[in-house]
Amino acid sequence: MNTIDKTIEEVLRLAAEHFKVQRDQLSPDDDFFKKLGINSLQALDLLTRVEQHFHIELPDYELQGVTDFRTLAQRIQSRL
């Protein structure tokens, strides 16, 4: 498993834990708004948790248009 795959898997695990769903219900290309039925405030909660977990800060401009786990993981990787 390469680095981006590990990051994707960790993001999926964090999302599943945060929203109390089974990890196997989520896939990298899922739109998290649609798949989890969340709103923008709930997405911000997840992003805060992700930033804390990876010890990074993702600027707002890097998150515009990010709605799937794979793209979020790519943004995280760019900060590690």
Model feature map: region roles:
Residues 42:
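Two-component histidine kinase catalytic core, primarily the HATPase_c
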Residues 2-38, 47, 52-80:
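Phosphopantetheine-dependent thiolation modules in NRPS/PKS and related acyl-activating systems
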